[in-house]
Amino acid sequence: MGSNSSFSARRTALAMAVALCCAWQSPVYAHGSEAHMVPMDKTLQAFGADVQWDDYAQMFTIVKDGAFVKVKPGANTAIVNGKPLTLQVPVVMKNNKAYIPETFINDVFQSGLDQTFQVEKRPHPLNALTADEINQAVAIVKASADFKPNTRFTQIALAEPEKAKVWDFVLNGTAVDAPRQANIIMLDGKHIIESRVDLKDKKILRWEPIKDAHGMVLLDDFNTVQQIINESPEFAAVLKKRGITDPKKVITTPLTVGFFDGKDGLKQEDRLLKVISYLDVGDGNYWAHPIENLVAVVDLEQKKIQKIEEGPVVPVPLTPRPYDGRDRVETVKKPLEIIEPEGKNYTITGDMVHWQNWDFHLSLDSRVGPMISTVTYNDNGKKRQMMYQGSLGGMIVPYGDPDIGWYFKAYLDSGDYGMGTLTSPLVRGKDVPSNAVMLNETIPDYTGAPMEIPRAIAIFERYAGPEYKHQELGKPNVSTERRELVVRWVSTVGNYDYIFDWVFHENGTIGIDAGATGIEAVKGVDRKSVV
């Protein structure tokens, strides 16, 4: 199974006994004919479900979006969201491996017990581009005589209709008659081109080169930089001064150079990246081993190092600092399950989310991440327009250290790197609670091809404490609970993992919780010179 869907490696003697008792000794039948059995792990992994073996209860727990399933090997009944469901064929074991009938997914997950997802009858005008529309938009611009073969794509997104028409659709159901269009930003070497295409008529509406601007740092730039560093004899020479003889153990991080009006000796018209490096010592955490006071300026067009900036040699810290837990004893924890036995209190219709009095549209942008749009709140029968569109506007991380390897560090994480592109798939039960619904999202990559990000966004309802309580002497207690709906997204930019929560409250307010986890940026220093 995948990283978030795995069977426990530990099997108790009782578990083995159950497996042997339920062993597949003879054909299994459904509706009078032999059932076609398939491996549980591969089948449910492909379906996107999370599977765990519960040693204590001697059963499998299966979680997929709004459904929480418990099933024992050999049992004719499964428990789906707290309700019994008769199985046509039980789960069977053969050679310690679980098998399910090919009808299992349809029987269990299409049983009508989960109504979280609804069919969208009228597409919302702000629905993100589909994979087919992304392919279509790219094909249109590639057919242009102005398109060059090595051009890359920094953004392909919906060209949004007029705001007034979108609101009219949301509030009154009036169809938006404007054709679907796409905005495209391309990078031809160091030259930026902005374009707009009509997806219905398959024609280009705009093609405009943008002057005095730099493009985003793309994922293939990381590979280009690493290759340049590995093959550079000049860089290998400066590594030797620091006792490093194998350049392939050096991990590079390409950073934007900033603007210093020529005082750093760099030309703003060149497409440059400053590269700082770390040493891979085998502990899985190269961030703990910075190669300090060494910066390579790489020209992406020329594909070579333009110059190397050096300061005093600082010894590379070599003490292993793993972060994956290999040096710690894991705390044994009993399972903590959050179930909704009667189903979700929210529904997802296409890209629209409805919870209590809230309705909003949700999509993922390759630059800013989640976009919450056309937010309304039903205030005693009146649908109030709360927010047209909300998203991360931008983010800057200035370090403020004057040293040679730090003074230029002021990352524009969203604008320079694309935080939506760097979305980190969420792990159920760790990054989000077990009752979360996971949403896959599709955005374009730098080649213009659709790229699906699994488990990109999570939605879940949670208990948020008591809303009100009063215990009058001699009278019954009066208490009410508070509920919240959370939309969670995580973006990993280098060593930092940024967590963003949009929190919808029952009282008509919206909160935004933002935080960072991951690994702190560290600086190597000579301890002899540190007080």
Residue spans for each PLM region:
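Primary recognition of N-terminal secretory signal peptides and signal-anchoring hydrophobic helices
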Residues: 2-122
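Short, low-complexity cationic-aromatic patches
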Residues: 33-38, 93-99, 173-179, 188, ...
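Extended intrinsically disordered, low-complexity coil regions enriched in Ser, Thr, Gly, Ala
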Residues: 50-56, 69-77, 112-119, 148-149, ...
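Short polybasic amphipathic segments
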Residues: 59-62, 75-81, 184, 353, ...
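Post-signal-peptide, soluble extracytosolic/periplasmic N-terminal scaffold domains
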Residues: 63-66, 120-245
